[in-house]
Structures are given as structure tokens and as C-alpha cells.
Amino acid sequence: MRIVAGIARGRRLRAPKGRLVRPTADRVKEAVFSILESRDGCAGLKVLDLFAGAGTLGIEALSRGASEAVFVDHGRPSIEAIHANLETTGLVGEVLSMPAERGIQQLAAAGRRFDRVFIDPPYGEGWIAPTLTALDAARLVADGGLVVVEHGRGEAAAPEVGGLVQQIARRYGDTHIAVYRANERDEDEHGNP
């Protein structure tokens, strides 16, 4: 695993110890960021990396100029790998050691919003739909923001989840990528998005 582009290009990243984490392959990561580059990239944007694993997607976004990145994972080996990878690359990110659902709730309670969200849960465990639903309900994705979901063969990514509408679906071997765009929403009577 390595950083593909940006200020930390070529740096090797550490995978979490154990066999429970499946880091995003470099060729899939290159394809994801090629899609994002065609849609204003990541420079100056706020990024959320859920089920972060080694943090490769969020760290790649930081290397490409994202203004901030928050990494959420509850596995100790993953948290250790994210910290080590941030140190190796000299990049700075916020690391939350908790399940994705709790991370979404905590970030929403703090009024945070993100322009790019990466969701890369363990394949075949049914995390995609509830995570997209929680993201939409919490309104963590800024209007026009993009959510990139990585999933395995045989898992479905719904065409629409609330205000998140699938724009792109691609397949790279056994890995599938779905990219959602957050529709603009009106504020409620209290001025909240």
C-alpha cells in the first residue's frame, strides 16, 4: 500500500495487524481518486473516512490537499495503523476510536459537515445501507458533497438513500465502487440544514 499522488506520493503505508482488515487496493484507490478529480478533487475539502482500516483513503485525500480528515474505526489494530500512517506521511488527521454509527452521531452532534465521505466496511456484513441512512439522517454530507462506497460482489448499493443519490457505479474485479451525491436541502424553521 502506498500514497498514489500529492505531497506524500510514494510513501508506503502500514496495514493493520490481523486478518480482519482488507485495505483498499492501490488500483482501486487510483480509480476512486480519478473519479473524484473529475468532480473537483479533494483540495481544500473536509473528508470523513468511515471504517477507516489503515486510513488509506483519508490519507490519500490529505496528500492531495484536503483541508482536514476525520478517521473513524473501532479496531485497535486499525487505530494504531492510522496513527502510524499519519506519522509516516507527516500529515495530520483526527482519529476517532469508535464504531461508525457512534462516530456519525458524535460528529453530527458537534455540527460537523464533510465534502467527501469514504465508506469501506467489511464486505458482506450489511453495513452499507444503515451507514448511508445514518449519514443522510445526520446530514453529515455537505450539499453537493460526494460519498464513495466500496463494497464486494453480491452486495447492493441502493440507487438512492434519502438525499443521497447514486451517480456512478464501477467494478474493479471483486470490488465495487458506488459514488453518491448529496442533494441540496432546505433549512428547517430553526435555520438548521
Predicted regions and their residues:
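Class I S-adenosyl-L-methionine-dependent methyltransferase catalytic core
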Residues: 1-193
